[in-house]
A protein has these predicted regions:
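Short amphipathic alpha-helical interaction segments
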Residues: 69-73, 77, 98, 106-109, ...
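Short conserved micro-motifs on helix faces and helix-strand junctions that flank
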Residues: 20, 49, 93-94, 123, ...
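Activity-critical C-terminal alpha-helical subdomain
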Residues: 103-138
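Alpha-helix capping/hinge segments and adjacent helical runs
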Residues: 86-98, 127-131
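C-terminal substrate-recognition/cap domain of FAD-linked oxidoreductases
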Residues: 1-77, 84, 88
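Short, functionally important structural connectors and interaction interfaces within domains
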Residues: 12-14, 98, 123
Length: 138
């Protein structure tokens, strides 16, 4: 069933999928929070995932939102979802890792010092910037 949910969402509306993880005991709080954030910003969501490991796929549905509201409110809502996730002891990326999407929100999950360390490690192993260029660190 889980594999069918994403296809059903795709066939009904424009959507944006996020991938979060929280401790299993915090899943109810995250779900309730996602619904509350969506209500505040005018979007609905379909959530599913791997409850056994706390992974939650959040499909934010455009539905009837106009393009301006979708484009302006979406990143605010995602930021709030990620802030909630981290406040519950979770991470802003589950099984897919940090990439183009989460790059904008790394400040929520990592301190400036931690990001500097990550950039330093990347520069040691990839001084020419040819491995996975522009994905997270240029």
């Amino acid at each position: 069933m889980r594999r069918s949910v994403g296809e059903a969402v795709k066939s009904n509306s424009i959507y944006k999928e996020e991938d979060t993880v929280v401790p299993r005991a915090e899943l109810p709080k995250l779900l309730k929070g996602v619904k509350s954030i969506g209500k505040e910003h005018g979007f609905k969501s379909v959530c599913y995932g791997h409850a056994g490991d706390g992974n939650l796929h959040i499909n934010i549905i455009k539905g009837d939102m106009n393009d301006k509201a979708w484009n302006e409110d979406l990143s605010k809502g995602i930021r709030e979802i990620f802030e909630l996730t981290v406040s519950l002891g979770g991470t802003i990326s589950g099984e897919h890792g940090i990439g183009f999407v989460q790059k904008e929100y790394m400040d929520i999950a990592f301190s400036e010092e931690n990001i500097a360390i990550q950039k330093g490690i990347k520069s040691i192993f990839d001084p020419k910037g040819i491995l996975n260029p522009k994905k997270v660190f240029i």
